[in-house]
């Protein structure tokens, strides 16, 4: 394989700012911001708006929002 073709794959911390959930994993992403992890080392910090810790589908707080009666309109159109 060629040298210097693939991006570097390093440890990073992803921080879900909505739920204040942090996870240490590996990624090709990098950041100038760092955070001290539980093991005492500094890792690049990637802030995300939503993750599995805060997404309604994964948290079980999923609800259907009917905007403008679309569901009723659909059910009337295709009712048997």
From Swiss-Prot:
<dbReference type="GO" id="GO:0003735">
    <property type="term" value="F:structural constituent of ribosome"/>
</dbReference>
<dbReference type="GO" id="GO:1990904">
    <property type="term" value="C:ribonucleoprotein complex"/>
</dbReference>
<dbReference type="InterPro" id="IPR042105">
    <property type="entry name" value="Ribosomal_bL31_sf"/>
</dbReference>
<dbReference type="Pfam" id="PF01197">
    <property type="entry name" value="Ribosomal_L31"/>
</dbReference>
<dbReference type="GO" id="GO:0006412">
    <property type="term" value="P:translation"/>
</dbReference>
<dbReference type="InterPro" id="IPR034704">
    <property type="entry name" value="Ribosomal_bL28/bL31-like_sf"/>
</dbReference>
<keyword id="KW-0687">Ribonucleoprotein</keyword>
<keyword id="KW-0689">Ribosomal protein</keyword>
<comment type="subunit">
    <text>Part of the 50S ribosomal subunit.</text>
</comment>
<protein>
    <recommendedName>
        <fullName>Large ribosomal subunit protein bL31B</fullName>
    </recommendedName>
</protein>
<dbReference type="InterPro" id="IPR027493">
    <property type="entry name" value="Ribosomal_bL31_B"/>
</dbReference>
<dbReference type="GO" id="GO:0005840">
    <property type="term" value="C:ribosome"/>
</dbReference>
<comment type="similarity">
    <text>Belongs to the bacterial ribosomal protein bL31 family. Type B subfamily.</text>
</comment>
<dbReference type="InterPro" id="IPR002150">
    <property type="entry name" value="Ribosomal_bL31"/>
</dbReference>
């Amino acid at each position: 394989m060629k040298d210097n073709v693939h991006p570097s794959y390093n440890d990073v911390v992803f921080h879900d700012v909505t739920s204040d959930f942090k996870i240490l994993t590996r990624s090709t992403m990098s950041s100038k911001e760092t955070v001290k992890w539980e093991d005492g080392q500094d890792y690049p910090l990637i802030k995300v708006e939503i993750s599995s810790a805060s997404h309604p589908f994964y948290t079980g707080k999923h609800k259907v929002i009917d905007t403008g009666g679309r569901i009723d309109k659909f059910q009337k159109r295709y009712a048997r």
